[in-house]
Amino acid sequence: MMMMGEGVSSVPPWSHLPVSGVDVLGGGGGGGDEMTPYVIAALRDYLPANDVGVGADEEEEAAAMAAAVDAYACDEFRMYEFKVRRCARGRSHDWTECPFAHPGEKARRRDPRKYHYSGTACPDFRKGGCKRGDACEYAHGVFECWLHPARYRTQPCKDGTACRRRVCFFAHTPDQLRVLPAQQSSPRSVASSPLAESYDGSPLRRQAFESYLTKTIMSSSPTSTLMSPPKSPPSESPPLSPDGAAAIRRGSWPGVGSPVNDVLASFRQLRLNKVKSSPSGGWSYPSSSAVYGSPKAATGLYSLPTTPLASTATVTTASSFMPNLEPLDLGLIGDEEPVQRVESGRALREKVFERLSRDGAISGDATAFATAGVGLDVDWVSDLIN
């Protein structure tokens, strides 16, 4: 207790300077600097700069959204699910940003796997409405037209990679360009040609295409029997003149009587019967143009063999081609004499000439000549014509 009359002692003011040897953060002296890193590490849990976990969550959410966008942007989803599948979201949202279909939406599409319609725009739908509805075979609206599997990304986009459309129907890179599978060709379009590819349906173009196709098919077969020799095609230079062809069709020649025609008809029928009864007989087409220069072929007659070794008989018809009768292969017959093949129609010839003798059409010498059994030569017919 201070006594009265004593002097007043002055108290110095409080110094704000740190005391030497004392650490403010450590709260004590002597080695306080060693505790500083631990204190800072403890305070880092409360610093606002530590947002590593929050950033990871945002990155995962962004990756999930990107995956969803990629799934919505793939070709399969665009062609078969975009504006086809019903939207399952219950709350109100922007339909233009939603890839799914909504009730009453104009962009709604029919499922191309369920409804078989083409990618061609429906003309009635453009005018205001189509009465056929979902049963229509054409596309209703822009989305059905350009998102159809037959048209989606089959053409390149004019903007390329700089395109900023939310939904683009075209390809931006060569990898995105879709190549449709090759269509099955019809039997009529076997031969590929520029004319066949550019056919537009006009009658003149179709006629030219069929003509081209016929020539291509016939010329591609080296053994085709329908092709005429190149030097003298039947359509350009027929072996027979019109008068000669008409005479053959009428079955008569000027200046020759009817009995001669009967003889020739009998010979022709006899030769045909032999060919039909032979196992190696048949019709064939000429393999060369040598028969076109035959003087006997121009008369329209069968050239009967004058010897047993004759191989071929030719005939010229009114249709401008000359078939060959297959020869009777006498070499394959071992025991049969060739003369017997020539004389097989002797009885028929005797009956024919007996009839001609009664009619007085031929002389008695010719009758004796036929009775003798010698092989007949029809070269005398040319003398009668001349």
UniProtKB/Swiss-Prot annotation:
Listed InterPro entries: Unkempt-like, Znf_CCCH
Disulfide-linked positions: none
Residue spans of biased composition, Low complexity class: 220-229
Renumbered residue ranges of the record's region Disordered: 180-200, 220-252
SMART domains in the cross-refs: ZnF_C3H1
Any one of the GO BP annotations: leaf senescence
Bias kind Pro residues: ranges: 230-241
Top-level taxon in the UniProt lineage: Eukaryota
Biased composition (Polar residues): 182-192
Keywords per UniProt: DNA-binding, Jasmonic acid signaling pathway, Metal-binding, Nucleus, Repeat, Zinc, Zinc-finger
Pfam families attached to this UniProt entry: zf-CCCH (PF00642), zf-CCCH_AtC3H23 (PF25512)
MF terms in GO: DNA binding; zinc ion binding
Zinc finger (C3H1-type) stretch: 116-143, 151-175
Record localization: Nucleus
A GO cellular component entry from the record: nucleus
Known function: Involved in leaf senescence delay. May repress jasmonic acid (JA) signaling role in promoting leaf senescence. May regulate panicle development and pollination/fertilization process.
Name of the protein in question: Zinc finger CCCH domain-containing protein 2
